[in-house]
Amino acid sequence: MKTLPLLLVAALVLCFGCQSDSKTIDTGAPPPPEAKPPNSPSPEIWLFAVTMDKLNLRNQPNKHGRVVYQLAQGEIVAGNGEISANKEEVTLRNIPYNEPYFKVTSTRSSLSEGWAYSAALEPVYAGSETTKPDIERLSALSGYLQTLPIGQLGSGKSAIEYVKRSFSSATGTLADAAFILLERFLFRMETAGNLYDLTEEAVAWEEHDSEAIRKEQFNMKKYPLTKSLAENGFRLEVGEGMIFPIVDWAILADFFVEKVTPPMKDYLLQCVSEQKDNPFDDGGIVIGLDTLAERAVFWEKFNLQNPYFVRKNETMQKEQWMRLILLTGSDNTRVFDFENHTVAEDFKKVWAHIGQKYVGTQLAKDVQEFTGICEKSGWKQTPNTEAWQTQYRNNQANQ
């Protein structure tokens, strides 16, 4: 099977895209939340869905620990937030990870407690015991999803219809968890199924199709395959000269947005908004830098306001990645001009914009620090500016 370039996949996962300066689409995204001191207590309980079959539960958080139980794919397990101090390198579904272990208990067998590798656990809830979702209903959904073959396009529609039938009255944390399970299933179809092959081989694309997709003007009913993709929860994206399917978050929002908790609603609406425009193409930034700054600040404030959000790892990555791009650029959108080695005007403008509009944010503080170095260097690329950017990349990667 042909695969999408890894850099493009990473960019799409972290940041779907928002609207650029030239567009005025009303996406319905919420304004950046006000940065307030965290007022939520540390979660009493975490719930996770097991994403790998026969996942070992060990008595110690390492590969040498004795296996006390094997968790089934789709099983819901509970934990109190205890994380191992050590990390281990493990390859799951051909993807290498270096992650810690979580201490969890099987909800099927209360006597089965131990350490499970965290990369094989998908968090679906973090909060108090009193507001946790119905584990039986989540287990039923998770179990049903395991029966659907991810390599068959029709599985998307089956999953969506099951959720609509079974969770029509769900609200709050139950709706949050159901959304996560459904989105993760569709994402597995996107990345591990054969959908890329379908769009490469089954459609004779017309020349203007790519531009229509970029402008949100493509009619998904145009071809039998694209009509089927839409019915099964997918939309089209363009990148690196290819047309490929991704999960359509607008479809998820249509069902879940008025059911989920307020933080999840903000998260969902922002992700729908960002998916309107892919921020990258061919290694370059293709949205306005001021739009990218707005997104970075949204996620910074969101993370401050929701310190225990169930998808905190993802939202922190979004914040850090966007901040990194704004200060170090990308392969084909460089901070320093390739020929004269001076700061590109677009970056100088957005840094000034950030300093004026987003006073007090971490982004503004980082920009102020770097622009001070740039000013001393005459806005030229020097060993000092390069050293700062290298250290900044390392700091962001280690957070």
Which sequence ranges carry the predicted segments?
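C-terminal motif of bacterial Sec signal peptides marking the signal peptidase cleavage site
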Residues: 14-17
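Bacterial signal peptide processing site
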Residues: 19-21
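Boundary regions of SH3-family modules and the immediately adjacent low-complexity/disordered segments
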Residues: 24-45, 66, 91-136
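N-terminal mature-domain "stem" immediately C-terminal to a signal peptide or N-terminal signal-anchor/transmembrane
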Residues: 36-39, 44-56, 63, 127-184
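SH3/SH3-like (including bacterial SH3b) beta-barrel domains
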Residues: 59-82
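Short solvent-exposed coil/turn linkers within tandem alpha-helical repeat scaffolds
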Residues: 64, 169-173, 250-263, 302-314, ...
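Acidic/His-rich structured neighborhood in mature extracellular/periplasmic domains
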Residues: 170-300, 309
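A cross-kingdom marker for long, charged
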Residues: 324-325, 336-399
